[in-house]
């Protein structure tokens, strides 16, 4: 076992050395791709929205619980002046029972779409009812391919169309209200920048850690070269997807760069976003995420202990049918 672990470790170290050398070479070949950020003193109203999910499997249906929370941090002259929540600091979760026939490949999309239904819906309402300068989503601001159902029941397809419509409302409302719409992807596994630069197919964040200096951003690039070739972007509308841009920001030498997406007809807006995010993301050198996003994550999070009361009520209401509805794996006699 020790020999096997050593072999794996050596392979990883060798690969990492190669990745670092290639990353530095890419920087030398593309010096204009890395921009120094001039951080500004935080001032304004910055919002964040995140959602939490828990799912329970029964034989006859799937029960999904979702909570989404909006958080607004108001800064003045570099100091946090106030914190507000939408619709409240700890709203009750919403429950969704589904009894549609469901193939295994559509379990993930069903759960993700249900979360997005609440999360993006909350973001739209948050925009309409709160004065903001910028709104950040936890994650991408676009629907992902993994969220699109593969065939499946018509109810699932209707759910997908409802979510796509909410995304359209989100973009339209942000534009109407003059709010910058952006998303922070904490742990990006994509290779969009690698593809754009013709680099080896590494995950962007893995090689950018070596290529970027603290306080830098990458030059914003289009989210996709051909939005019409991606099913979910085509469903959303290529006119919207064509105005979504991507860059990475490195706020600390002890943490990886994180990905930022934003909606604008002018990619130069990315520099303004980075100027705000940089100082706010340097509170903790080992976890460079802006505090309003962290607060939204904490407020939206669902844990099974907090939902035990609701689940016990349901179990009691089902009575003798309870064991029938439980998945067989939960009834193992050993």
Report each predicted region and the residues it spans.
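Long, contiguous domain-sized segments
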Residues: 1-44, 101-104, 108-334
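Metabolite-binding pocket within alpha/beta catalytic cores that recognizes anionic/polar moieties
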Residues: 29, 35-45, 58-72
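Two-metal-ion RNase H-like nuclease active-site motif
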Residues: 44-54
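Generic structural motif
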Residues: 49, 83-87, 260
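Short loop/turn segments at secondary-structure transitions that flank enzyme active sites
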Residues: 52-55, 72-77, 141-143, 187-190
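Acidic, metal-ligating active-site segments
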Residues: 54-96
């Amino acid at each position: 076992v020790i020999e096997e672990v050593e072999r794996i470790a050596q392979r990883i170290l060798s690969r990492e050395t190669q990745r670092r050398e290639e990353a530095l070479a890419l920087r030398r070949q593309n010096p204009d791709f890395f921009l120094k950020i001039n951080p500004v003193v935080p001032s304004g109203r910055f919002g964040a929205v995140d959602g939490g999910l828990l799912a329970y499997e029964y034989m006859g249906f799937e029960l999904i619980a979702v909570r989404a929370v909006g958080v607004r941090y108001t800064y003045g002259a570099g100091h946090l002046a106030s914190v507000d929540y939408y619709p409240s600091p700890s709203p009750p979760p919403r429950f969704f029972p589904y009894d549609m026939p469901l193939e295994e490949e559509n379990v993930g999309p069903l759960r993700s779409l249900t979360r997005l239904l609440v999360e993006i819906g909350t973001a739209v309402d948050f925009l309409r009812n709160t004065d903001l300068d910028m709104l950040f989503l936890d994650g991408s601001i676009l629907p992902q391919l993994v969220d699109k159902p593969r065939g499946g029941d018509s109810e699932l397809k209707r759910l997908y169309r409802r979510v796509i419509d909410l995304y359209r409302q989100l973009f339209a409302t942000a534009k109407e209200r003059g709010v910058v719409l952006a998303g922070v992807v904490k742990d990006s596994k994509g290779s969009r920048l690698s593809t754009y630069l013709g680099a080896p197919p590494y995950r962007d964040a893995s090689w950018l850690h070596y290529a970027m200096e603290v306080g830098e951003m990458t030059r914003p690039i289009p989210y996709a070269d051909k939005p019409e070739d991606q099913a979910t972007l085509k469903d959303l509308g290529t006119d919207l997807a064509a105005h979504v841009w991507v860059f990475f920001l490195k706020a600390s030498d002890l943490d990886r760069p994180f990905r930022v997406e934003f909606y604008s007809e002018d990619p130069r807006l990315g520099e303004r976003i980075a100027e705000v995010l940089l100082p706010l993301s340097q509170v903790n050198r080992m976890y460079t995420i802006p505090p309003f996003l962290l607060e939204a994550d904490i407020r939206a999070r669902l844990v099974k202990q907090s939902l035990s009361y609701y689940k016990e009520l349901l179990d009691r209401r089902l009575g003798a049918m309870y064991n029938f509805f439980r998945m067989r794996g939960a009834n193992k006699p050993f």
